Amino acid sequence: MRIREVFSAIASAVLALQLLCVNLSAQSSPGNVTDIAVAPQYDTTHVYVAPEDFDRFVGSLMATFGGTTSKQGVFTVTPTPSSTMSQLVLTPVGTLSVFGFKTPIPYPFGAERTGYLVTDFDAAVQAARTTGADVLVTPFNDPIGRDAIIQWPGGVNTQLYWHTTAPSYKALQTIPENRVYVSADRVAAFVDSFLAFSHGSVISDDAHAPGVEIGRPSDTYRRIRIQSNFGKLTVLATDGQLPYPYGHEVTGYEVSDLPATLAKARAAGVQVLVPPYTAGQRTAALVQFPGGYIAEIHASSDK
């Protein structure tokens, strides 16, 4: 009886400890952060060009993808003194925030790849910290709202923003992908952090994706595709030994007719850096717009 009582007591203690651990984990889990995303059309790619290239760049985007623009203006969008031309480009395949600084660009601006609109700014900044991101630029006011710059594990910089008056953009025809290159050493930390923050899901995780996608057709690499209310995100985990221009493209734009889109792009002064190739259920090309912005453009190859 004593042995049975001892085992029973041990079992009860183990169960109590397990329940305590689960409870503590639930209280502290990054997965419990609030979902503060709005919609993919508010995930803006940030593009910095020289002021003299500004109009030509915006014009080439419009000629390639179509869409509309906001009124161009000159603003201070950093917490320290600066001056930049700024314009929003709303295309059916993605939204871009274009900057043409007339003054030196304060650090670390210019290194952020995208801006995410959030429903609750303070909660978003706290969620970023909770899920493992660094806050590189603490919250500050801009002419139309509030901003901060965060950095995910792996060195990926992102702007979080909130507008005093909520914007209203048309839903996109196709959702672009934020293309993030990270090292194999940091890919797990980046993915865990981003998933917890974004409430996203892994759509695919291919440990042997075709290397032609990163300019190395004889090799393979790891490609992870994630989707959330912020939009699509593709993680490219590589050894960093990439031929130009791979790694410079920030966004991949999905179109219905790649040859027609590339024809429009060429006519608008866009240079095709990597001719179309087919891999991973898409046909894709890499292009460079006037002003230097490099992008991937693709169409589904299984339609």
Language-model features, listed with the residues they occupy:
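Core segments of cupin and vicinal oxygen chelate
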Residues: I36-A39, H46-G94, T130, T138-P153, ...
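Short beta->alpha transition motifs characteristic of CBS
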Residues: Y161-A166, I297-K303
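Vicinal oxygen chelate
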Residues: P40-E52, Q87-V89, F101-A127, R146-Q151, ...
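Short, structured interface segments
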Residues: A148-Y169
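N-terminal secretory signal peptides that target proteins for export/translocation
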Residues: M1-F7
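Catalytic cores of nucleotide-enabled group-transfer and carboxylate-activating enzymes in metabolic
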Residues: L96-F101, A133-L136
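Boundary at the C-terminal end of the N-terminal hydrophobic targeting segment
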Residues: L24-S28
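Bacterial N-terminal signal peptides
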Residues: A9-V22
